[in-house]
Amino acid sequence: MKNPLRSSFSTEGRRMAGARALWRANGMKEEQFGKPIIAIVNSFTQFVPGHTHLHEIGQLVKAEIEKQGCFAAEFNTIAIDDGIAMGHDGMLYSLPSRDIIADSVEYMVNAHKADAMVCISNCDKITPGMLMASMRLNIPTVFVSGGPMEAGELDGRHLDLIDAMIESADTSVSDERIEQVERHACPGCGCCSGMFTANSMNCLNEAIGLALPGNGTIVATHKNRIQLFRDAAKQIVENAYKYYRDGDDSVLPRNIATRQAFLNAMSLDIAMGGSTNTVLHLLAVAQEAGADFHMEDIDMLSRKTPCLCKVAPNTHTYHVQDVNRAGGILGIMNELMKAGLVDGSTRRADGLTLAEAVDKYAVTSPNVTEEAIRKYKSAPAHRFSIQMGSQESYYKELDTDRAEGCIRDVEHAYSKDGGLAVLRGNIALDGCVVKTAGVDESIWKFSGPAKVFDSQDAACEGILGGKVVSGDVVVITYEGPKGGPGMQEMLYPTSYIKSRHLGKECALITDGRFSGGTSGLSIGHISPEAASGGAIGLVRDGDIIEINIPERSINVRLSDEELAERRKAEEARGKKAFTPPTRQREVSKALRAYGKMVSSADKGGVRIVED
């Protein structure tokens, strides 16, 4: 049975003459009435290199959709550049922007009763925000991202944004060298070239099934990226007709993003050592989808999924462009599926099951298509460009070496332990997250005295001022979703630790979060957070923190009685209990509202709205 068009509320009937007049004023042709209206949800902005090349793409998608008879209308969301917002109070706005993006998409699409949508995303909070909206709306949706930036090159080696941050804080590096790194680290459009948050989410979108093959890995500058947008436009029209004309609800986001799809996506994330932010985002998207997917599932998967792909910042050898050459996300999914670690029966927006997509697109599959080979041979041009599709370079051959190449099979895994782990203990009763792919195995077991700071700013000053020494555990409190408010990323503190050559000699733990560019023994999302009465807010300078990644534990060496006494003393502060004792920070009304409504990190840091 076919489903009625949502847009019929504004396009049919005598009383809708005014609305139809406005649709005509928007350019709708007579023959387009009665057909699906497709929203193009773009995120173009000139503040973000991951989005600066999207200004013409929305209209390209519109033209492709309208070739097939439907009407398409474009609008934009906000988009924050985490790298530019980093290191000052601008970062307080990053995570809250995810929910604002989700709201804005819901508002626009529901207000105008669009029937389907193409989501053009790319960077950190934009993809998860649009994903959250797609689950709320549950109308046919296809995602296509702006693609990864090419890796920078200097002195014969790859580099990226994180190199610029680390070297700029290293007093042994000359100003001339820093200028050279700065000029070469980010060679144009696309989201930063490592497996940071933006690229991680665009890759996970392939695993969830809402994005087409190559979405996460074909560089932004390549002509094949433009073809991906055309393919997405054709796919959304096909899916809209499947749902509204044919009554096929298998194309709806909630029927694609099932519990098993989230398990598949998290297995991929663990296997490729993706950003810890993906934990927050997948939990948030699953909550909007009504999928039974929780922190306990992530813990379970982390104990059985090996690390099959190691990319910057976890190594200097490979960037996302190298993952593409090795067969992209479906190349990794193929290895996971062969080992029985993902479910091949999950559905996708392109109408295939995961198993069918792997058979068609995995470069080591005997049935791999010429289209797939062409996608994964898409190469960087090694020149500066801020224009999508400005080059057509190809690798001469693919990387199909599963023993020593970029993507490994299970037998030759980088490590039997996966790239992410959930730890628990007396200062993280509800869990915390560490990217094990970025931690040297020599410090998987670590203990040391706490150096406590009640803000990121204070921690940066302490690290650069020499207050942190070898063996210390830096503890940053009151930077969680509620305590920040906004749950800042701690990229500068971790980068400064590296710049002081303490990357393998110190740990950092926080109720805040980390950039996807972070590596080292950096443990975030500690829940409950300090501002919610979490025990991390009871840690004091000199307390011994014990971290054991193999045993998935993190504790402060204090008895239950000692912690209870400290809690009693803290609560005696009255209204000031579990607030930062020394921090001076102005918090806007918008951020205060977010802080009063937000859930803890182990629940995805989403807003709580009472029924």
Swiss-Prot record:
Mg(2+) binds at D82, D124, K125, E489. The active site is at S515. Keywords: 2Fe-2S, Amino-acid biosynthesis, Branched-chain amino acid biosynthesis, Iron, Iron-sulfur, Lyase, Magnesium, Metal-binding. GO terms for cellular component: cytosol. Pathway: Amino-acid biosynthesis; L-isoleucine biosynthesis; L-isoleucine from 2-oxobutanoate: step 3/4; Amino-acid biosynthesis; L-valine biosynthesis; L-valine from pyruvate: step 3/4. The keyword Repressor does not apply. It comes from the Bacteria. It catalyses: (2R)-2,3-dihydroxy-3-methylbutanoate = 3-methyl-2-oxobutanoate + H2O; (2R,3R)-2,3-dihydroxy-3-methylpentanoate = (S)-3-methyl-2-oxopentanoate + H2O. InterPro entries: Dihydro-acid_dehy_C (IPR042096), DihydroxyA_deHydtase (IPR004404), DiOHA_6PGluconate_deHydtase_CS (IPR020558), ILV_EDD_C (IPR056740), ILV_EDD_N (IPR000581), IlvD/EDD_N (IPR037237). Binds 1 [2Fe-2S] cluster per subunit. This cluster acts as a Lewis acid cofactor. GO terms for biological process: isoleucine biosynthetic process; L-valine biosynthetic process. Coiled coil: none annotated. Its cofactor is [2Fe-2S] cluster; Mg(2+). [2Fe-2S] cluster binds at C123, C192. One of its GO terms (molecular function) is dihydroxy-acid dehydratase activity. The modification N6-carboxylysine is found at K125. The keyword Phosphoprotein does not apply. Residues 565-586 are annotated as: Disordered. Homodimer. Belongs to the IlvD/Edd family. Functions in the biosynthesis of branched-chain amino acids. Catalyzes the dehydration of (2R,3R)-2,3-dihydroxy-3-methylpentanoate (2,3-dihydroxy-3-methylvalerate) into 2-oxo-3-methylpentanoate (2-oxo-3-methylvalerate) and of (2R)-2,3-dihydroxy-3-methylbutanoate (2,3-dihydroxyisovalerate) into 2-oxo-3-methylbutanoate (2-oxoisovalerate), the penultimate precursor to L-isoleucine and L-valine, respectively. This is Dihydroxy-acid dehydratase. It comes from Parabacteroides distasonis (strain ATCC 8503 / DSM 20701 / CIP 104284 / JCM 5825 / NCTC 11152). The gene is ilvD.
